[in-house]
Every structure is written in structure tokens, then in C-alpha cells.
Amino acid sequence: YSPDGLVGETGSIEVKSRAPKKHLATILADEVPAENMAQIQCGLLVSGRLWCDYLSYCGGMPMWRKRVHPDPAWFCAIIAAATNFEAVVADITNTYTEAVVGLPATERIDYTEGIVI
């Protein structure tokens, strides 16, 4: 997790630069856009921070801030998704490992070797 900033010992910030239409919609709704909430809640989960200030801005318009606190329901959903992802990756890895047993390895050619930019 890489927050846009840490605030004191307990807070963090996430800053989004928005197009005017999106920024206006955020201000009028007075809530963090759904597409950003997973990022914020995941950040709170892994960092242990107590809050995150979500900042939305668009040049020439007022900056908007909303303080977000940890949400146990989000934490459960994030942990469940991560656990499921780990199981899927482990299954794919095992399937691949079994499928390639005894197959000959091929040479990998690096066509960019020697190119200097």
C-alpha cells in the first residue's frame, strides 16, 4: 500500500485529481466514489491507520475532503477476496507444475540484448 501521504501517527491521505464532471458529482454526492473506497479500506486494513482523508480536487474548483474510518464489512470482504485469490493462484500453479513435468525446456532468446537507448 502506498498512500499519498501519512498524517501524524494515525492518519493517511489519498488525493485524486478529477475531471470537472467527476469532481462536481463527488461534491454533490458528499461521499467517496465507490471506485476509490476499496483502495482506501485496503490501505486502512494493511497500514493499521485509524483514518484516511480522501481529497478530491479539480483546478479552479473547491477542494473536497471526506474522512474515512475503517469499516469491518469492507475488511471482511477484502480478506475473503485475498484468501480466494491465494487459493486460485495456488491451484493454477499446481496445475501448471503438474502439466509441465517431463516437458523439455526451450531456449529463450533475448532480442533486445545489446540494444542501447
Regions found by a protein language model. Name each.
Residues 1-117:
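Accessory terminal regions of nucleic-acid processing enzymes
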